[in-house]
């Protein structure tokens, strides 16, 4: 999940943490903070980690800040946005896009920002795989 601390979707951290707690025996959630959209992740890595813990009690991994779009896109997100999947490819449109990979690292689903962590479409995709 590409994340940001000052975004309208930031409260999704709460749902992501709940999902992680409920599914952590078979699901790993990893947050990748990025400042690509509206400067909504201006903090340092330490500030981001503190924010996530203090405001949302996040226990899933929060990585160092990355770029998810543009000339300096991180290799992982370059792959995630170009890899063939049943949903769509292309640039990330905003913070909190979600990518579901299987246990072999195959990209199987991608969800736009508006899909909440507790949405049935996301939960069904997790259960199916």
Predicted segments with their positions:
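Loop/helix-junction capping segments adjacent to catalytic residues or to phosphate/diphosphate-binding pockets
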Residues: 7-10, 38-39, 70, 116-120
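Thiol-based oxidoreductase modules, predominantly thioredoxin-like and allied folds used
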Residues: 2, 26-44, 59-70
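Thiol-/selenol-based redox modules, centered on thioredoxin-like
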Residues: 75-78, 82-129
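Predominantly extracellular/lumenal beta-strand repeat domains
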Residues: 17, 30, 64-65, 69, ...
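Conserved helix-turn-beta segment immediately C-terminal to the redox Cys motif
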Residues: 5-35, 52-56
């Amino acid at each position: 999940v590409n994340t940001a601390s000052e975004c309208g979707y930031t409260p999704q951290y709460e749902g992501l943490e709940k999902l992680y707690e409920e599914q952590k025996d078979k699901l790993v959630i990893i947050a990748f903070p990025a400042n690509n959209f509206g400067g909504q992740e201006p903090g340092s890595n330490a500030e981001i980690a503190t924010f996530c813990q203090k405001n949302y009690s996040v226990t899933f991994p929060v990585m160092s800040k990355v770029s998810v779009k543009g000339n300096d896109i991180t290799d992982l997100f370059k792959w995630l946005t170009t890899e063939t999947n049943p949903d769509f490819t292309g640039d990330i449109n905003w913070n909190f896009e979600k990518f579901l990979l299987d246990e072999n690292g195959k990209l199987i689903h991608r969800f736009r920002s508006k899909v909440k962590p507790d949405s049935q479409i996301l939960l069904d995709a997790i259960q199916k795989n």
